[in-house]
Regions:
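Cytoplasmic helix-loop-helix junction between adjacent transmembrane helices
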Residues: 132-171
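Helix-loop-helix hairpin linking two adjacent transmembrane segments in secondary transporters
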Residues: 128, 157, 166-213
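Conserved MFS/SLC helix-loop-helix module at the cytosolic interface between two early adjacent transmembrane helices
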Residues: 88-126
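Paired small-residue
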Residues: 112, 116-119, 127-135, 329-337
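Helix-breaking motifs and short loop linkers at transmembrane-helix boundaries and internal kinks
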Residues: 69, 101, 122-128, 156, ...
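Juxtamembrane intracellular "pre-TM" segments in multi-pass secondary transporters
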Residues: 24-33, 214-246
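C-terminal transmembrane helical hairpin of 12-TM major facilitator-type secondary transporters
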Residues: 306-349
Length: 425
């Protein structure tokens, strides 16, 4: 009796080999296809709305300090409560998306956050505003937790760095436009009107996202059983690289948010006395982040994430050093370089998550972003204490300490062995 053996690859007729290749290509979305364009445009809109809704309040902090009679650290809560609840929500919405799917969770999240922002514009009390900002953050966790996972599942691995970079470019443009629009508008209209404008723009972005994002093709439902969830979290923390990437997210985002939370206070005071509208216009430094997130993401695909991560953190340190100088001609370029480095580093680190997490990718993305937004919330408010104690020098020392931790983590990540079955990263 003869045993049947599978034919070797060179024995398979070329027509069949072509069919096999075509089938594999159909699993992933390839660069240059209409599906790729729809996907990156939709996620760009989602990233835009997320960061615009979160960070539109940052230029308003000095104004809110005066209007509600709160200090700088208390004023920073309008951002910290949103990012803090977003971080908590990530631990819930990520696993939910692993069970029920990606697109429905993201669409619901965007519309809910936009509507909460519109409602916050009508709130007359500080505590009422903080409550709705907390709901904005909780809602946005549904997009933030799932977007990275969706891309890692649907986009071909060789293009994931570019796709993730374009998504983060949407974050950068949203953060810039949110700050720019409110920063300029509050010189001419009330902060309530400025918030209504941002909420309206986010509703438009949510509608575009809903209409053009392709449905998932590679999604496989996972159990929501507590044991299954615990196994996923345990597996990620046993990995040599993922906990380091989670720590990297915390310190990088903490440094970035702290700088932009308090640079406005510095520029409105002596020796600059800049107008509020002019301080708001400085949000154009985000343009460097728009470029770096896509460019560095693509370079990481070619040169490796290990090299690009520490290099972009070094750029952040150089930018911080420039902001410590007194001349405005050095401070503004420093903000530009710092922003370029941050978005480049975030693009590299976030695309690395999908390469390290071989299972339960939604949970891995949620843990990364939990750390990311926890860093924003904790360090963003702690920076207010540094400002109170030492002014901008105190803030600079605090940010510098965070970046030195980030650099040491990047060096450790560069020394990790490549996972079996993965290409070098």
């Amino acid at each position: 009796m003869k045993t049947a053996v599978a034919p070797l690859a060179h024995e398979i007729p070329s027509r069949v080999q072509d069919d096999v290749v075509t089938e594999l290509k159909d699993i992933y979305i390839e660069k240059g296809t209409p599906m790729f364009m729809r996907t990156v445009l939709a996620l760009f809109c989602g990233g835009f709305a997320t960061f615009a809704l979160l960070y539109c309040v940052q230029p308003m902090m000095p104004l809110l300090s005066r209007e509600f009679s709160v200090n700088a650290a208390q004023s920073s809560l309008i951002l910290s409560v949103a990012t803090g609840l977003l971080a908590v929500g990530l631990l819930i919405t990520g696993p939910i998306s692993d069970r029920i799917g990606r697109k429905s969770v993201m669409v619901t999240a965007l519309f809910a956050a936009a509507l909460c922002t519109v409602a916050s514009a009508m709130m007359p009390t500080w505590h009422g505003v903080l409550l709705l900002r907390a709901l904005v953050g909780l809602s946005l966790s549904g997009l933030a937790a799932v977007a990275m996972t969706y891309l890692s599942e649907e986009i071909h691995p060789k293009h994931i760095g570019l796709a993730m970079g374009l998504y983060i470019a949407g974050n950068a443009i949203g953060g810039m436009c949110g700050r720019l629009i409110t920063g300029v508008l509050i010189d001419f209209v009330s902060w309530h009107t400025a918030m209504l404008v941002i909420g309206g723009l986010a509703l438009i972005a949510a509608a575009v996202f809903w209409r053009i994002l392709p449905e998932s093709r590679n999604f496989r439902p996972r159990s929501l059983h507590p044991r299954s969830l615990l196994d996923g979290f345990t597996r990620h923390f046993r990995d040599a690289g993922l906990p380091l990437l989670f720590l990297e997210a915390f310190v990088l985002m903490g440094a970035f948010v702290t700088l932009f939370n308090y640079i406005g206070y510095r520029l409105l005071a002596e020796p600059y006395h800049l107008d509020q509208a002019l301080v708001g216009l400085l949000s154009v430094v985000y343009l460097s982040g728009i470029y770096s997130s896509a460019k560095v993401g693509a370079l990481a695909d070619k040169l490796g994430r290990r090299k690009m991560l520490w290099a972009t953190i070094a750029l952040m340190l150089a930018g911080l050093a420039l902001t410590m100088a007194t001349p405005l001609a050095l401070v503004i370029p420093g903000m530009l370089v710092f922003t370029f480095g941050f978005f480049g580093a975030h693009s590299v680190a976030s695309s690395w998550i999908g390469r390290r997490a071989l299972t339960a990718k939604g949970q891995a993305s949620s843990l990364y972003l939990f750390s990311y937004y926890a860093g924003s919330s904790v360090a963003g408010t702690a920076g207010g204490v540094a400002w109170h104690l030492g002014g901008w020098n105190g803030v600079g020392l605090f940010i510098g300490a965070l970046l030195l931790v980030a650099l040491s983590v990047a060096v450790k990540l560069a020394k990790l062995p490549v996972l079996p079955g993965n290409m070098p990263v």
